[in-house]
Amino acid sequence: MAIETFLALEASGWKGKRGTALVQVKGDAAFIRRATRALAEGGRCQIVTLRAGATPVASGIVLRHLSRAFFFKLGVDEQFAKFSPGVQLTLELTRHLCADPEITSVDSTASPDHPMINPIWRGRFAIGDVLVPLRRNDPLVAMIHAALIARQFARKTARRAVRVARNLKSR
């Protein structure tokens, strides 16, 4: 089954080492199995797999809604890292989606300035958060807004710190 191949590949790589693979988070594996099956029945989910012979080396989950596709998740066999299986799958997926007359746009769902996706998919959608107060002049809105800004700053700072620590560790 394609979802099992994806889950195994994702868990075998860096996501598995960091404990963030779907099969490692309680309930996530069961949820993704049910969700992909239900969405696939309606033509709204594809699991694509790149193989070297019979060996799966990369797999991704693509979600579809109306005329848009979303490259939701990617898992790779890091034993094949020197061949860039994630990039190879993304390139093949790009050709596939560009040839699909029903798809007008694709979202990588990657973070801004993602090192793998940016050189391949250069276009960007402007996406933002909107906070809508339910009561006029609600003071809670300003506090929530400040908390969201603080969270974003903390995440960026933490990511930078992790990057620096990894660079120091690899020296």
Where are these regions (language model features)?
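Active-site/acyl-donor-binding loops of N-acyltransferases
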Residues: 98-169
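Short glycine/serine- and small hydrophobic-enriched flexible loop segments
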Residues: 34-37, 92-99
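A conserved beta-strand-loop-helix scaffold within acyl/acetyltransferase catalytic domains
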Residues: 1-82, 170
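A structural signal for short secondary-structure junctions
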Residues: 41-42, 55, 63-66, 88, ...
